[in-house]
Every structure is written in C-alpha cells, then in structure tokens.
Amino acid sequence: PAPYYQCVFDHRLFDLFHDALKKTRQLFTLEDRPFGQSIKLLGGDGFSWDMEEGIYSGYTISYFALQLAVYMGFKKIFFLGLDLKHDGHNTHFFGQDPQTINHEKTEFPRMIKMLQHGANVLADTGIKVYNCSPVSTLEAFPKISFGDAAAL
C-alpha cells in the first residue's frame, strides 16, 4: 500500500521514483518540485512550528519531516533508518551518489547539529522523538528498538 505521508525534497527522487511518489496520498516537498504539497523553504538553520510560514531544511529530509510531524500534532515521533553513516559504497538508500561521497565530513556534521537543535527545541514540549535505528551516529534522540517503539 502507498504511504499516507511522505517527504521528499531531492529533485533526483522525483525522477527515480516518479510512479511510487505519485501514489503517495500526501507528499510534502519544497517549492519548485514537479508535484506534491509544496512548503516554502526558510533556510537551513532554524525550527518552524508553522508550515504555512515555511520550513527549515536542517540539511536533511529527516529534519524537514520532524518539523512537519510536530506541526501535524504528533506527540511521539520515531526515526527509522536514520544512521547518518555510509554503508560501504552506498551513500543513500537508493545506492551510491558520487556527489555525496564525503558527506560524513561535510554534510553529516551539519545534519547532526540541526537534529540536536530540534531535540533542544522540543525538550520541554512533551513531544517525544526516538531513534529506532540500531546502528546510528545520531545521539540527539533516545535510541530504542523497533519492537519497543511498537509497544509504546
């Protein structure tokens, strides 16, 4: 079945997964993408509580999705597959991208900084964010197993 909600802002994914993305019930993306519910990009650093004003990229779709989930009213948010590390030659879930081979030194530190910022912003709100990725360099959110997450 098609996912209810999906977030994509990488232009390449609209070409690679065009048919699958078209089947998504609610696709959230940035302005100037071929289709989907577009949200104005406010910049890289910051945290948006109101998608009508816009969203911050945090340099990763995970940060985009975090803000969107908060805006939608979710009180428990679970990250799965957010490892922020390369697995051998693969740089992304869809394989290798030569343009991002150095992400661990260039982009990952910015992503980690912003995800930590998100954790700090949400610390006293009652919104709980969990990292269900068994192998992950991200320490901003408590790590729990997928089984424990499903039991919450």
Located regions from the model:
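Metal-ion/cofactor- or nucleotide/acyl-coenzyme-handling active-site neighborhoods
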Residues: 1-152
